[in-house]
Curated annotation (Swiss-Prot):
GO terms for molecular function: protein domain specific binding. Its main location: mitochondrion. It comes from Yarrowia lipolytica (strain CLIB 122 / E 150). InterPro entries: J_dom_sf (IPR036869), Tim16 (IPR005341). Keywords: Membrane, Mitochondrion, Mitochondrion inner membrane, Protein transport, Translocation, Transport. The lineage of its organism: Eukaryota, Fungi, Dikarya, Ascomycota, Saccharomycotina. This is Mitochondrial import inner membrane translocase subunit TIM16.
Amino acid sequence: MAHRLIYQVVVTGTQVFAKAFTQAYKQAATAQAASKTSKSAASKFGGLQLDEACKILDVDETALDKVVAELNKKHKLEDIAESESVLAQIDKKFTHLYTVNSEHKSGSFYLQSKVYRAMERIRGELELDPLPKPEIEEPKKKEEEKK
């Protein structure tokens, strides 16, 4: 009788442990698959997440989501005009931050790179053309000023 009771306890404990182990394994597998997709999207655009890129360029994520939706629809002219104004504001912020952080103006190449990668990430999200680097006016050298 005692053997039967011990046997039932061992079998029941093994079943509970096996079920818990398989559920934990399934959860770990789905979490790993989800992290791979988010990491691949981030690595495609310089390692920046979209929310981080929006923070760098001071862009409202909801406005960006509206632009993406309108670019996908493209049926109302007034909505497209609103989207273009948001894109123009983003371009203006990018140009300003990129120029301010240029090495010629005692800026930081690191910050300039962050600004560039943020804009690259946003343009990638909007599926726009690749981003050209803006022209920066270089300061005149002392030799040119003497002539």
